[in-house]
Every structure is written in structure tokens, then in C-alpha cells.
Amino acid sequence: LPGGKSSHHLLPNAATDWSAVETIDDQNKPMHSTMNIYIGSQTKPNTNIVAYSNYPPHFKFELPMSPGKGVIMAEDNNKGFWLVHTAKYFPNLALAIRDLFSNEKTTKEAAAFLCMSYSDVNLRAIAKIIDYEQPIVFFAQKSATVQAFYDSSEIQKLVNGLHKYQPTASASGDGIATLTPPGTVKIFASAPVGYSSDIYLNYIVKIMKKSFQVYTPGTTTTVLRRSCVGTLKVENVL
């Protein structure tokens, strides 16, 4: 939004959908409060962190790969959050909270932030979904006290990459509630390159009866078939 560091947030019961929260890094504002959970902590080494972006702090230019940007943080009491955003040079976790939005690359263009709290079990499931974006992980930290989350197969695959997918197929749907119901339907599906059945048309499409997008692992060299039948659309993203 115009005005340097001006910011707005969504409130479901507000008189207007977009409510002003003044300067984004002012104390007690949404982003300040969220990021200060870690930056202001006296036990930073006890936090599990995975941060990914195609324009991380200190990079000279934007990388042309996966555009996904986000941060997963999990504490030692089985909870954490997933912050999805579009900001460049964010977050530089070495900075003080007052300097988090000090870089011109971060404030020059408008950016969106969406933060969701989850249990560590659900965060691992989210990590598995994020992995299909083939994100560029620029910062990762393993908790010094509770390491099971970081050592889980989902987080390890997200951080280290270069893994192989087993010959299985699965599908799941997730309805997203917004200020204008019914919202958006997201579909996540996976199938090996050599799978004998066309899972996308024979299974998912018949069940969901909606347009959706199919994500395939970014390491594959095989482009799956596109199909558009009526209102149904299947698109491959490599």
C-alpha cells in the first residue's frame, strides 16, 4: 500500500474490510507482535525455523525459480505459525525488531502477509505441501531443546530437498473461509511420473467437480497432460 510503511489488516467484524494499523513495525501492531515472538525471545536457539524466499536478505537480485515466500516457526510446546508473504528481503532474522522493515527493497513495493497458527503436527503437513513449490530455503534452525519437529521427514525433505517420491497417489481438499463465502477450494495431489492410472481425471476431477491446479515435483522432466473439459481445468506446474 502507498505511504512507505503504512499497513492495513482484515477484520471479519469491522465496519470496513480493510482497517488501518498505521506503521507496520510500530509496537503491538500485527507484524511487530508476530515477529517479535522470536526476535524478542531470550531463548532463540530453542526455536525451530525454516525461512524460504526467492529474494532473501543480502541477495543482489530476485531468483527466477519458485516465487514462494514464507516462514515456519515452531516452539517447544508443540505449536507454531506459518507466515506466508510477498515481501522482498524479508525476514532478516539477524535484525532488531525495529529494523525488520528498514530495507528499501522491503518497503518499496506493497506486500501481503498472512499468518496462521498451527500445532507442530499440522506444520509438518504444511511443510510437505510447500515442498511441491520447490522453495528456496535461505535460513533453517534446529531447536536446541526439542528437535523432533526439525528431524521429522517432512521438514528434512523441505530443507534438504533432492528426495524421491514413492509410487503412491493421494489427494486432499481444503476449503478456505474468506470474508465472501464460500471462499476458495485448493487441491493438492501427487502421483509418480510412471503411475499407470490418470489420477487427475479419473479420480480427483470426478470427486471435486471444480477447476483446480495440479502441482508436480519441480525435479521431474515429464510434463503431465493438460485437460480442459467444460468448467474443469487441470494445469501442470513444474
Q: Which residues make up each language-model segment?
A:
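PLD/PLD-like phosphodiesterase catalytic module centered on the HKD motif
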Residues: 1-238
